[in-house]
């Protein structure tokens, strides 16, 4: 077995070109056996900032007599040699070591990538949090040797996790990462080879299938249908459940009698029975959740009618569905059906996941997220994003490519192509049959904006955390786009040699006649050119917006809060704003021409979609 060196550095800052190393810690190990350690402070030849001293505990006096980095390099080079280097966010450490001429060709391993994949539901992936989660006997202290020891311990624990993975999933992760360098490839190859001494045969089997995809789809059943003759609630009878000596006090030991809760409960019961609107303010400690859940549940059961509850925060949504509603079920002792429904982007799409696997990952972010999916789905029964940690905008961009947020996939298409096993379809089925349905403000308002085409029919609505409704409405009814989003979209679109357009060309070669293929190739080349032109003109557009905002600040520095400007008629006459309009006209012109080319490509795909190839339908949906 080859030894590995876990390395951690403390530095004067984050940029290796402008900052330097102040401490080096390294641990050489083989399996779980520590072979040697290396530790030294480094004289940076400059002052250490108070921030770094507070973070690391390393001050100027401590490094004043320490050796310079040039004196340390020979010993560190001899300690590491050509062994693989392990780190947590290892690119950071290696970038500083490369800057002083060290270890430019060493293989690198990253415990961040390992943890992100093998612990898909971990709340945080920083070194300190992982050390606590995995019960590492050392603490991450922002001192180099301590953190190197924790990194080695995290590696050892995570490698044990890898050895416990199903062999077909390990094989699939190794196959998918075959042409992409990333920080955990060494670990999965090592684990696979240890479990299977035969040569790797990269199966394209359904390694991702887990409980949710193996269980039969839910049976189609009639949606909830309200009674015509509504049965009113007795407000005092409903609130008696929350009185001293009531059912709640007998079941739950933490019962506390709250007069305000009783009053709110009775008022909501009367509101439901009499059919009027209610605006109520409940202070902290009122117990408002139970005050509205109990009458809502009883009303929905008596009248076979749905009550929709909208919240602003995920925390409250989780509290309602995982704690409060189960308590209500126990309290009223009935067959209350309750579920939570989220936006499409919160659910995995197995069809898009399979298409993503077929094209193979093209970056470390893509292989990391895809590997995380395979491991998560071996256990998940929901396909719900809330179960896992998608960390940062780059991972979020990958998730967007495999989520159910696909306008081209309708319920009918989902049932036809996937047999109703899709997480979003299951969630909608549960919502259709629920007496109490929990959503968030964003989904509620999206349903309003689309003419009630998202949520099942409802007549009764309770808006909790209503003080956030105005800002949620602003967000729901507005449009937002950023320069990085445009650049990611253009990259995904690609051209003749990469991305979506390249996949369209590749698939079409097996179907189209030479003349039609040549025409498609020409259109794709035109689309590639227009995409490049739009990308450049959109950059100029955002630059002009930046110049306009800077002009509006009139020399003032940008503060902590974002800068807001209302575009009123007087603003539109200013030269900086005229530059914005001119740059947008150019970007818009390129975008329109790009759309025209994409429409022509889509028309070609439509003509050949009757060949029965699902990949054509996937490409049409993506484009």
Listing of model-derived features with the role each one plays in the protein:
Residues 84-100, 120-122, 126-191:
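Acidic, Mg2+-coordinating catalytic module of metal-dependent nucleases/exonucleases
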Residues 269-270, 289-303, 323-327:
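Walker A/P-loop NTP-binding motif
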Residues 1-107, 113, 120-142:
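Conserved non-catalytic scaffold segment of RNase H-like nuclease domains
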Residues 218-228, 235-246, 304-435, 505-507, ...:
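A substrate-engagement module of RecA-like helicase motors
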């Amino acid at each position: 077995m080859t030894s590995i060196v876990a390395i951690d550095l403390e530095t004067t800052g984050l940029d290796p070109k402008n900052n330097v190393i102040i401490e080096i810690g390294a641990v050489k190990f083989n399996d779980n056996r520590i072979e040697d350690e290396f530790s030294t402070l480094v004289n940076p030849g400059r002052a250490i900032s108070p921030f770094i001293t507070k973070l690391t505990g390393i001050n100027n006096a401590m490094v004043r007599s320490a050796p310079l980095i040039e004196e340390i390099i020979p010993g560190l080079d001899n300690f590491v040699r050509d062994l693989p280097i392990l780190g947590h966010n290892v690119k950071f450490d290696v970038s500083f070591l490369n800057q002083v001429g060290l270890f430019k060709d060493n293989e690198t391993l990253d415990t961040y990538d390992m943890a992100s994949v093998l612990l898909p539901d971990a709340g945080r992936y920083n070194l300190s949090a992982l050390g606590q989660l995995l019960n590492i006997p050392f603490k991450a202290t922002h001192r180099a040797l301590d953190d190197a020891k924790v990194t080695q311990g995290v590696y050892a624990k995570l490698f044990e996790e890898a050895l416990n993975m199903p062999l077909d999933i390990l094989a699939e992760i190794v196959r998918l990462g075959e042409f992409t360098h990333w920080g955990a490839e060494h670990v999965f190859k090592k684990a696979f080879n240890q479990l299977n001494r035969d040569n790797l045969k990269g199966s394209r089997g359904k390694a991702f299938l887990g409980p949710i995809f193996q269980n039969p789809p839910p049976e189609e059943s009639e949606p909830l249908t309200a009674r015509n003759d509504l049965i009113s609630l007795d407000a005092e009878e409903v609130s008696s459940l929350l009185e001293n000596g009531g059912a709640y006090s007998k079941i739950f030991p933490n019962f506390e009698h709250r007069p305000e809760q009783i009053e709110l409960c009775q008022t909501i019961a009367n509101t439901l029975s009499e059919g009027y609107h209610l605006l109520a303010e409940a202070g902290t400690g009122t117990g408002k959740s139970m005050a509205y859940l109990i009458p809502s549940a009883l009303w929905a059961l008596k009248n076979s009618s749905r009550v929709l509850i909208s919240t602003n925060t995920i925390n409250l949504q989780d509290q309602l569905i995982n704690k409060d509603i189960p308590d209500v079920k126990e309290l009223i002792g009935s067959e209350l059906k309750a579920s939570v429904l989220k936006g499409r982007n919160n659910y995995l799409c197995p069809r898009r996941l399979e298409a993503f696997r077929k094209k193979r990952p093209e970056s470390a972010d893509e292989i990391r997220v895809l590997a995380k999916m395979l491991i998560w789905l071996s256990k998940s029964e929901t396909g719900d994003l809330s179960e896992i940690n998608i960390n940062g905008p780059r991972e979020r961009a990958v998730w967007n490519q495999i989520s159910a947020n696909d306008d081209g996939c309708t319920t009918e298409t989902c049932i036809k192509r996937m047999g109703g096993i899709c997480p979003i379809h299951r969630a909608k089925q549960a919502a259709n049959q629920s007496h109490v349905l929990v959503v968030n403000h964003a989904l509620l308002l999206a349903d309003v904006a689309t003419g009630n085409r998202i949520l099942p029919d409802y007549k009764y609505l309770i808006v909790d955390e209503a003080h956030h409704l105005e800002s949620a409405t602003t967000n729901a009814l507005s449009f937002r786009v950023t320069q990085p989003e445009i650049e990611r979209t253009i990259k995904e679109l690609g051209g003749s040699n990469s991305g979506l357009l390249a996949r369209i060309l590749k698939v079409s070669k097996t179907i189209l006649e030479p003349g039609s293929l040549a025409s498609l190739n020409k259109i794709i080349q035109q689309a590639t050119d227009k995409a490049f032109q739009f990308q450049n003109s959109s950059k100029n557009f955002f630059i002009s917006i930046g110049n306009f905002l800077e002009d509006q600040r009139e020399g003032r520095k940008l503060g902590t809060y974002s800068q807001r400007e209302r575009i009123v008629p007087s603003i539109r006459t200013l030269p900086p704003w005229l530059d914005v309009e001119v740059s947008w006209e150019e970007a818009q012109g390129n975008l329109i021409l790009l759309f025209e080319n994409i429409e022509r490509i889509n028309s070609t795909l439509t003509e050949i979609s009757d060949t029965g190839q699902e990949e054509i339908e996937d490409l049409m949906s993506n484009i």
